[in-house]
Amino acid sequence: MGSYMNKTSVVKVGNVLIGGDNPVVVQSMTDTYTADVEKTVKQILALHKAGSEIVRITVNDESAAAAVPEIVKELAKHDCHVPLVGDFHYNGHTLLSKYPECAKALAKYRINPGNVGFGKKKDTQFAEIIKIAIANDKPVRIGVNWGSLDQVLLAMLIDENNAQENPLSLQQIMHKALITSALESAKYAEELGLAKDKIIISCKVSEVQDLIAVYQKLAKECDYALHLGLTEAGMGTKGIVASAVSLGILLQQGIGNTIRVSLTPAPNAPRTEEVRVCREILQNLGMRTFTPSVTSCPGCGRTTSSFFRELTSKVKDHLDEKMHTWKEQYHGVEAMKVAVMGCVVNGPGESKNADIGISLPGSGELPVAPVFIDGKKAHTLRGDNISEEFIEIVENYVKNRYGKK
């Protein structure tokens, strides 16, 4: 962890605690048409199985609002009780009022101050949602987005800034507008009677440096629980790297209580990728452990064979597949470290440092693969069945070390 931890209020969302000293929570969002109950339930189940601890769904029209209670019922049939967050823009006050069962079924409401209402209607419509949240004992995320920022507030801050002797840059004013919108909305929610421990706030942008600057300032100005993430991270490597860099820096500084990685999925790619990235960020920072880690070398001229890459892939896939049952049977197995190395240079050393590791022969080396367990050489594998034999050794290690004594 970093040199300090941003102490915040603790907010209960369904059965999940966010903020305070609680672990950083992984969130995700569906991209199905919410009124299609079957498809939405299927995707929520997949996201939850992948490790999402809270799932947000779009509630944008009456058919979506009417579907929410049915979605919750169907999830319960699968013994899935993941908290669902309703994502409201423009008409949340109307939908929550007209569909009280939707308001009851959701675990949290998300409001965007930039489009909850306009002109004289803004405060009234915001207040309607807050009062419904209070009546149903639900928390609220006040989520400000760069792309839908309150234009009246922004114009006012620009005018005030232009009158200053040493005006701020437009970028700094945008940062100020994001924070002001979030904090003023949160303050108004409290004035309406919503408790501080029912409020989570976020100020999302799409650029790494902007996100870091905004949240560093936001964390100094409040003690609300903070939802962290780029509002649109992008696709593929770009989206993953941008999210890992920005979230990693802030989390290392103790800023952020729950995260979502807003990736643009590649065509036909699983929605669960965003959950995997969240978990990898937290695990690589040492903040959470979800699944055994696999250390493997990148390969070089010494590792002319592709076998070490194939074995690494097989081991990783095996661990991921087994974790669904292992996490219930073997307490602590998620912290296990496995090494699959490709030659004698770093192979034995990395294998000894892992809980269990294998050092495969590189180019010109003897065709044998020593296996190290808890820092000591335990086996020597050779022949055509090294993959199967090593995976069997891993299985036995898990049972012996993490099984109930």
UniProtKB/Swiss-Prot annotation:
Coiled-coil boundaries: none
Gene Ontology molecular-function annotations: 4 iron, 4 sulfur cluster binding; 4-hydroxy-3-methylbut-2-en-1-yl diphosphate synthase activity (ferredoxin); 4-hydroxy-3-methylbut-2-enyl-diphosphate synthase activity (flavodoxin); iron ion binding
Cofactor note: Binds 1 [4Fe-4S] cluster.
Top-level lineage group: Bacteria
GO biological process, one term: isopentenyl diphosphate biosynthetic process, methylerythritol 4-phosphate pathway
Swiss-Prot/TrEMBL cofactor(s): [4Fe-4S] cluster
Binding site for [4Fe-4S] cluster: 297, 300, 343, 350
Catalytic activity entry: (2E)-4-hydroxy-3-methylbut-2-enyl diphosphate + oxidized [flavodoxin] + H2O + 2 H(+) = 2-C-methyl-D-erythritol 2,4-cyclic diphosphate + reduced [flavodoxin]
Pathway: Isoprenoid biosynthesis; isopentenyl diphosphate biosynthesis via DXP pathway; isopentenyl diphosphate from 1-deoxy-D-xylulose 5-phosphate: step 5/6
A Pfam family the protein falls into: GcpE
EC id: 1.17.7.3
Keywords for this protein: 4Fe-4S, Iron, Iron-sulfur, Isoprene biosynthesis, Metal-binding, Oxidoreductase
UniProt enzyme class: oxidoreductase
Physiological role: Converts 2C-methyl-D-erythritol 2,4-cyclodiphosphate (ME-2,4cPP) into 1-hydroxy-2-methyl-2-(E)-butenyl 4-diphosphate.
Family that this chain belongs to: Belongs to the IspG family.
PANTHER family assigned: 4-HYDROXY-3-METHYLBUT-2-EN-1-YL DIPHOSPHATE SYNTHASE (PTHR30454), 4-HYDROXY-3-METHYLBUT-2-EN-1-YL DIPHOSPHATE SYNTHASE (FERREDOXIN), CHLOROPLASTIC (PTHR30454:SF0)
Record NCBIfam families: ispG_gcpE (TIGR00612), PRK00366.1 (NF001540)
Protein name, as recorded: 4-hydroxy-3-methylbut-2-en-1-yl diphosphate synthase (flavodoxin)
Organism: Francisella tularensis subsp. holarctica (strain OSU18)
Organism phylogeny: Bacteria, Pseudomonadati, Pseudomonadota, Gammaproteobacteria, Thiotrichales
